[in-house]
């Protein structure tokens, strides 16, 4: 007897993605494919796409959290490029990482040089008191 009967074979386990094994939302399989197709190296280790997907997921979560806070500060429920710009430029480390990046429709940080602000003179206060 060959053992290929219906009752003899084991049921195949449900497929489990590498992303779910690593506890990630970002696609490990797709990152692996892109690493192979991108001609970055002749061979790609099994851990490399997992690590890269984890790093990308962390950076994305960090930026989105700060952008969500910026949107909430502006009393908005939808994140727009302006919120991403404010989030990145107000964070020292993200600003350094993405210093050369231009965000379309991002605008600029509000900034007025101290010299251009009106001077607070005490002569007006003394004149009113007399």
Swiss-Prot record:
UniProt's post-translational modification comment states: Deiminated on Arg-4 in granulocytes upon calcium entry. Monoubiquitination of Lys-120 (H2AK119Ub) by RING1, TRIM37 and RNF2/RING2 complex gives a specific tag for epigenetic transcriptional repression and participates in X chromosome inactivation of female mammals. It is involved in the initiation of both imprinted and random X inactivation. Ubiquitinated H2A is enriched in inactive X chromosome chromatin. Ubiquitination of H2A functions downstream of methylation of 'Lys-27' of histone H3 (H3K27me). H2AK119Ub by RNF2/RING2 can also be induced by ultraviolet and may be involved in DNA repair.
The principal localisation class reads nucleus
Pfam family membership, one: Histone_H2A_C
Q: Which CDD domains match?
A: HFD_H2A
Question: Can you list the GO cellular component terms from the UniProt entry?
Answer: extracellular exosome; nucleosome; nucleus
Q: Where is this region: Disordered?
A: 1-22
- In the record, N-acetylserine modifications are located at 2
> Subcellular location, in the record's words?
Nucleus; Chromosome
Does the keyword Zinc belong to this entry? Answer: no
- Resulting phenotype, residue 62 to A: Decreased interaction with VRK1
Which positions carry N6-crotonyllysine? 37, 119-120, 126
Modified residues annotated as Citrulline in this record:
4
* General function of this protein: Core component of nucleosome. Nucleosomes wrap and compact DNA into chromatin, limiting DNA accessibility to the cellular machineries which require DNA as a template. Histones thereby play a central role in transcription regulation, DNA repair, DNA replication and chromosomal stability. DNA accessibility is regulated via a complex set of post-translational modifications of histones, also called histone code, and nucleosome remodeling.
This one is known as: Histone H2A type 1
Gene name in the database record: H2AC11
């Amino acid at each position: 007897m060959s053992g290929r009967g219906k009752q003899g074979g084991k049921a195949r386990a449900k497929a489990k993605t590498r992303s779910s094994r690593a506890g990630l939302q970002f696609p490990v399989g797709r990152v692996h494919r892109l690493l192979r197709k991108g001609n970055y190296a002749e061979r790609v280790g099994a851990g490399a796409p997992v690590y890269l997907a984890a790093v990308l997921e962390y950076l994305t979560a960090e930026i989105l959290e700060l952008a969500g806070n910026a949107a909430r500060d502006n009393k908005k429920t939808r994140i727009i490029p302006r919120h991403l710009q404010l989030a990145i430029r107000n964070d020292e480390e993200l600003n350094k990482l993405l210093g050369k990046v231009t965000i379309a429709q991002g605008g600029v940080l509000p900034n007025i040089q101290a010299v251009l602000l009106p001077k607070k003179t005490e002569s007006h206060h003394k004149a009113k008191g007399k």
